[in-house]
Amino acid sequence: MFDQLKESFTGNFEIAEAHCDAPCGIYDPASARIAAEAALSMTKKILDLKAPDGSDAKATAAYHNTLTRYIVVKEQEAHHAKEQLLILWTDYFKPVHLEKFPNLHDTFWKAAKLCSAVKVEVSLEHATELLDAIKEIHGMFWASKDRDVAWYTAG
């Protein structure tokens, strides 16, 4: 009997990550902003990257390596921005906030869709629109706390 009980506690468990159903009460749209800025930066780098002459195998390999790295970072950061926005939307904002921000759901929905677009496309327009959407969410978030926190970007 003891062995069965012990076995039930030592099995393979999937690791769950969360922010934060404790609830910790620590929320800030800055993490979404930083991720969106990184995705925008990678989008610009991808668009600026010049393909080498196809006859130079070493330069072509370096180009593909750099392009792949930029794409991976862009996709990771767009996904991270989406995760952070969804946390704010579903964990921080409450029905009472809809009175003050009637467009809250639409704003977050559009921002989440932009995260997906930035992830799968190389669109300077969508990457910029995502940062603009997060700026709007930043304003709502800090207004909901009756605080005036200036918007800024790190880049």
What do the predicted segments below correspond to?
Residues 1-67, 102-136, 140-155:
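N-terminal intrinsically disordered, cationic/polar leader segments
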Residues 7-8, 79, 96:
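A generic short-segment signal for beta-strand/edge and adjacent turn/coil regions
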Residues 65-77:
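Alpha-helical scaffold segments that form or flank carboxylate-/histidine-based iron centers
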Residues 74-82, 86:
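Heme-based O2/NO sensor domains and their adjacent alpha-helical segments
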Residues 84-101:
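Short, solvent-exposed, charged loop/turn and helix-capping segments
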